[in-house]
């Protein structure tokens, strides 16, 4: 939807719950012709509990460096995590909620220890702050790099009207809301992907 609203043709390299800053994904993006690139980083790293804060920054730098090897000047928009209450301040891993399964419903819970964030476990809040800081530092030498806080697409104030049905994934109406907000933020005059 966002691509249609922006009048662009999208190539989607989303990996359905498995986007982990994998080098092969960055190499594919590097080698694929593109006028602009956006990458959303966050939730899969937390709910799979695959990385610690110490490794996160270097992994993001490496991912962006690889993309920039093939697209040194194209607009590159880094999008932080959307709001997800179960993982805002509680690390993963995420798991099926057994009580919900017992009722015939699918819901997710965060099984990590909130105190582990102070020892390097990732939460969405930690990722959001690290991404904002990392992109801000890189922007000094990369004027075509931009950051969009995922809260601007779906934040705490949206949760009451648009709750996550399974505590993790947005429903169809919320996807439309997120797509519309992305299009307005990215493609509007003055936006990081405007004029494509």
Region spans (language model):
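Histidine-centered active-site loop/cap adjacent to the catalytic His
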Residues: 163-196
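The substrate-binding groove and active-site-proximal loops of carbohydrate-active enzymes
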Residues: 42-57, 114-125, 166-169, 173
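A short helix->loop->beta-strand "cap" motif at the edges of active sites that frequently abuts
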Residues: 71-76
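Oxyanion-hole/transition-state-stabilizing segment in secreted/luminal serine hydrolases
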Residues: 19-61, 66-69, 81-88, 107-109
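Substrate-gating cap/lid alpha-helix
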Residues: 88-148, 177
